[in-house]
Amino acid sequence: LNNLFGEITWFYPTQSSEIVNRSVTYNYMESSSQRPIWTTGSLARTTWVDSSVFGLPHGTSYNATGTSYDVVGNTEGATTYYQHETGTDQVKSSATTTVAANIESGDYDITQGQQGGADIRGDGEFIMKIRRFVPDFLSQSGNTQITLNLRDYPNSSQASSSLGPFTITSSTTKVDTRARGRSVSLKVANTGSAQDWKLGGFRLDIQPDGRR
């Protein structure tokens, strides 16, 4: 439990691992019955204590390069103790490591109606042209990377906009993209140290486009 952000996390080992190496999180604070919010990740913690005990969450993880033990049946290693929700990077043994993270939306397409007569719609049939987007962060430290992933068909591989990925600073007002496709998804990521962001409501300038 992380009551600072309304999250419940389960840490577990994957089928090929003997130790915890993955996690799945449910956000009960921002979820609804129609839109539950789940996230998955590689955060591995063997123990966890919520912020209600020490003021901030604390956890431990298995470290395979730690001390050896001459005990038959035990796995060699040691435990690393972490304090969470402080700063933007991982600090371990005086070394600072970037916490790379990203979030990506589902595919979005446009539905075009017909003027007069029957309302004939082709859901996902029309090519869209994305001229620009307006980034919106409720808070931002450092730079943030935005990628527009495009598809022409559901089974096609994703392709980034030819001008992307785009680097967003705290002073960026708009970004021209010249992207086109039947569907698009938005990926937001931090890739360097001292980067942090809280996503707001992005706006994309979209219009129907020809097939050629």
Q: Can you annotate each of these PLM segments?
A:
Residues 1-212:
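Beta-sheet repeat architectures centered on beta-propellers
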